[in-house]
């Protein structure tokens, strides 16, 4: 863990880039850090540093979510760069769940594409209420009319998924040109809009501590570190937490807290943190579990839910499903297979239906009434739901 201390002298906001593969999310993230680094407000992160894994470099696409941090004069931002490729949507869901607001990157050259639509749907599902649209690659489009048509198409899409498409700010630019240093105006405008359009987040610090585990690392000689975004509550060093879900519940003492390689006295809702846990080995904790205040949460495998099933036009199923249907259920940072039971008076569920479902998961996970989830099958999102009642 680090020896530098994280200063809470500015409002902390979690943002991120979402959108279709190759529309420029990672290039935009790199351009933001480069431009702010010249003002001493960020560490310059190259495209290759953000697209970290060997497979990402070879395929030229983002697979895992990547976190960078930067500041404006007004705020401190934690920025998640989400994968746009359809195969890695589950990592996108994890990243989006950590955001207070999103930057939807749309190539002005290509317009709305399948993952543009899916990411907007999922952003709403995980609780993001505001998006800013960055129309990228504007330098490749010669006709102003074309950019205007793409903007109209995106506004319609936002309205369709209950975002305020009419009032959503649009910023035009070229992330690549900005990264090359020839046209930085779009990036400066985007940062200005981030500061002004996105309100200071209201943090849920009074409720019991809860953090979904996104990653797990070992520090030789120190112990095991769990990383993630604190969903609610506060925690400080020497306090006890429970590790809940997927396996038998375990207890651990917190011996260190860190955010962006700087030490914290305490962590609170909204912080992206690494938590050092005493007495826990690498194989006793995994992504998809949660850290929670002891006694505040339990793991369950059967629940009642209210669900919306997407239409074919929304990228969902083409056909109905029946009892014993077995898709994947995505909660916070985990995905679990389970099966659906329909209520006695319901014979089948059609695309476009809003319905009540009984869900039984293969593994127990930390859930409670109000927990949101996505339903996926064969690489696409087919439904969005909320837990209404725990059964067992």
UniProtKB/Swiss-Prot annotation:
Q: Where is this region: G2?
A: 60-64
Keyword Calcium on entry: no
Chain intervals for the UniProt region annotation (G4): 136-139
Q: How does it assemble?
A: Monomer.
User: Which superkingdom does the taxonomy of this entry point to?
Assistant: Bacteria
Q: PROSITE patterns given for it?
A: G_TR_1, G_TR_2
Q: Which organism is it from?
A: Apple proliferation phytoplasma
Cellular component, GO annotation: cytoplasm
Q: Which InterPro entries match?
A: EF-Tu_GTP-bd, EF-Tu_GTPase, EFTu-like_2, EFTU_2, G_TR_CS, P-loop_NTPase, Small_GTP-bd, T_Tr_GTP-bd_dom
Give the location in the cell: Cytoplasm
Q: What is this protein called?
A: Elongation factor Tu
Looking up Gene3D superfamilies in the UniProt record yields: P-loop containing nucleotide triphosphate hydrolases (3.40.50.300), Translation factors (2.40.30.10)
Binding of GTP: at which residues?
A: 19-26, 81-85, 136-139
Q: Does the keyword Ion transport apply?
A: no
The UniProt catalytic activity note for this protein reads: GTP + H2O = GDP + phosphate + H(+)
Q: Which family does it belong to?
A: Belongs to the TRAFAC class translation factor GTPase superfamily. Classic translation factor GTPase family. EF-Tu/EF-1A subfamily.
tr-type G domain residues are 10-202
Q: Which residues are recorded as binding Mg(2+)?
A: 26
Principal localisation:
cytoplasm
Gene Ontology molecular function? GTP binding; GTPase activity; translation elongation factor activity
């Amino acid at each position: 863990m680090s020896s530098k201390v994280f200063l809470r002298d500015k409002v902390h906001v979690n943002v991120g880039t979402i959108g279709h593969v190759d529309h420029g999310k990672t290039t935009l993230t790199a351009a933001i850090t480069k431009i702010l680094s010249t003002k001493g407000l960020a560490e310059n992160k190259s495209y290759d540093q953000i697209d970290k894994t060997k497979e990402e470099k070879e395929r030229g696409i983002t697979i895992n979510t990547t976190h960078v941090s930067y500041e404006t004069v007004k705020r401190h931002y934690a920025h998640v760069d989400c994968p746009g490729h359809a195969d890695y949507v589950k990592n996108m869901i994890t990243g989006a769940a950590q955001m207070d607001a999103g930057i939807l990157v749309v190539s002005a050259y290509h317009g709305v594409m399948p993952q543009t639509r899916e990411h907007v749907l999922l952003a709403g599902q995980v609780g993001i209420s505001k998006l800013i649209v960055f129309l990228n690659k504007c330098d490749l489009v010669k006709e102003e009319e074309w950019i205007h048509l793409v903007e109209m198409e995106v506004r319609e899409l936002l309205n369709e998924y209950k975002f305020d498409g009419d009032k959503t700010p649009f910023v035009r630019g070229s992330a690549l040109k900005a990264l090359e240093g020839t046209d930085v105006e779009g990036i400066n405008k985007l940062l200005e809009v981030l500061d002004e359009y996105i309100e200071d987040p209201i943090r849920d610090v009074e409720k019991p501590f809860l953090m979904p585990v996104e990653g797990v690392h070992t520090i030789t000689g120190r112990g095991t570190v769990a990383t993630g975004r604190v969903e609610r509550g506060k925690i400080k060093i020497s306090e006890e937490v429970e590790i809940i879900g997927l396996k038998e519940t375990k207890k651990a003492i917190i011996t260190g807290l860190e955010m962006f390689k700087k030490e914290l006295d305490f962590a609170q809702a909204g912080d992206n943190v690494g938590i050092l846990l005493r007495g826990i080995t690498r194989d006793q904790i995994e992504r998809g579990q949660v850290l929670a205040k002891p006694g505040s949460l339990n793991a369950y495998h059967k629940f009642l839910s209210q669900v919306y099933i997407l239409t074919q036009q929304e990228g969902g199923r083409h056909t109905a499903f029946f009892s014993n249907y077995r898709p994947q259920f995505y909660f916070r940072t985990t995905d679990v297979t389970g099966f659906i039971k329909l209520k006695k008076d319901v014979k089948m569920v059609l695309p476009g239906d809003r319905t009540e479902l009984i869900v039984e998961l293969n593994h127990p996970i930390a859930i409670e009434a109000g927990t949101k989830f996505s339903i996926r099958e064969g690489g696409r999102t087919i439904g969005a739901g909320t837990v209404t009642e725990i059964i067992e």
